[in-house]
Amino acid sequence: MLGWTLVFLVVAVIAGLLGFTGIAGAAAGIAKIIFFVFIVLLVISLLVNAFRGKSPRL
């Protein structure tokens, strides 16, 4: 749990730096690309697990 807290802290600090330095527009463009890349990876992962017959671990 502490590990996740540190990860989110680092993400928040980076987001704050990007937001307050005026390069938020470029960061938003990159974030959109990364978002869609991870959506594609999620779909691929779900399909692979469905074909293998494994249920997702929660």
Curated annotation (Swiss-Prot):
Family in the record: Belongs to the UPF0391 family.
InterPro entries linked: DUF1328
Chief place of localization: membrane
Classification via NCBIfam families: PRK13682.1-3, PRK13682.1-4
Subcellular location, record wording: Cell membrane
Transmembrane helix among keywords: yes
GO cellular component: plasma membrane
UniProt keyword list: Cell membrane, Membrane, Transmembrane, Transmembrane helix
Topology in the lipid bilayer: Multi-pass membrane protein
Membrane spanning stretches: 6-26, 28-48
Pfam families on file: DUF1328
Lineage: Bacteria, Pseudomonadati, Pseudomonadota, Gammaproteobacteria, Alteromonadales
Name the UniProt record assigns to this protein: UPF0391 membrane protein Sbal195_1447
Disulfide bridge partners, by residue number: none
